[in-house]
Swiss-Prot record:
GO terms for biological process: gluconeogenesis; glyceraldehyde-3-phosphate biosynthetic process; glycerol catabolic process; glycolytic process. Belongs to the triosephosphate isomerase family. This is Triosephosphate isomerase. It comes from Mycoplasma capricolum subsp. capricolum (strain California kid / ATCC 27343 / NCTC 10154). The lineage of its organism: Bacteria, Bacillati, Mycoplasmatota, Mollicutes, Mycoplasmataceae. Homodimer. Pathway: Carbohydrate biosynthesis; gluconeogenesis; Carbohydrate degradation; glycolysis; D-glyceraldehyde 3-phosphate from glycerone phosphate: step 1/1. Keywords: Cytoplasm, Gluconeogenesis, Glycolysis, Isomerase.
Length: 248
């Protein structure tokens, strides 16, 4: 049985003070033992979060694929590991679109994280144009094929996949639960082709895209949706608690 994994993503929002206030309100109220609850925050807030959070896993929103070097403005795996970061989001559509990250970049990031015993949350998802062309499954599976190149099945089961249709991120539009389940099911079937059925069944697949307390239950009751990666609805303490303490 795969444990549900629900992570908020603050993106470029908040301050150290607002994170302190947020964790004071939520950390001791995260009380669902069947769920891993987390929050991805900007780099400058990571140490604050790790110091204060006991029940909420604090994640980074990105990492560079090199261990060190002349990469101004970047952060390495070793820097994150030193301060206690376990989870890192990679391949978010905003980074793909704004910073031209490719699936091969994301593959390198996944491998360096896994080599350092950290857990990548690997984002994938299609544009509205791709969806309207009826090519969602083909597109997303191609992303997965490239990202999981040369990753062993022993490492693959440590990863988390976040299926986030680009057209549903921050727009208020959502893939309905049946459509989201269909894509997540096809992702798992593709993972079974890359590895085997047993490995595919062990990999956590989240859904993201305008998830909020009022609809999270609808998604998480689906057999192939193992959690959620949530943006805007994770910024307020009450909303976050409504997500991670949802009624099954």
């Amino acid at each position: 049985m795969r444990k549900k994994v629900i992570f908020g993503n603050w993106k470029m929002n908040g301050t150290n003070k607002s994170l302190e206030d947020f964790l004071y309100q939520v950390d001791n109220k995260v009380n669902n033992s069947k769920i891993t609850a987390g929050l991805a925050v900007p780099y400058v807030m990571l140490q604050t979060g790790i110091k204060l959070a006991k029940n909420v896993k604090i994640a980074a929103q990105n990492v560079h694929f090199e261990l060190k070097g002349a990469y101004t403005g970047e952060i390495s795996v070793s820097m994150l590991k030193e301060i206690g970061v376990e989870y890192v989001i990679i391949g978010h559509s905003e980074r793909r679109e704004m910073f031209f990250e490719t699936d091969l970049d994301i593959n390198k990031k996944a491998k360096i994280l896994l080599e350092n015993n950290m857990i990548p949350i690997i984002c994938c998802g299609e544009s509205l144009e791709t969806k309207e062309q009826g090519k969602t499954i083909e597109f997303v599976n191609n992303q997965i094929n490239l990202i999981y190149q040369n990753i062993s099945k022993q490492d693959a089961i440590k990863t988390i996949i976040a299926y986030e249709p680009i057209w549903a991120i921050g727009t208020g539009k959502t893939a309905n639960s049946l459509d989201a389940e269909e894509v997540c099911k096809k992702i798992r079937e593709n993972l079974a082709k890359i590895y085997d059925n047993l490995t595919a069944e062990k990999i956590t697949i989240q859904y993201g895209g305008s998830v909020k307390p009022s609809n999270i239950q609808e998604y998480l009751k689906m057999p192939n949706i193992d959690g959620a990666l949530v943006g805007g609805a994770s910024l307020l303490a009450n909303d976050y608690l409504g997500l991670v303490n949802y009624n099954e």
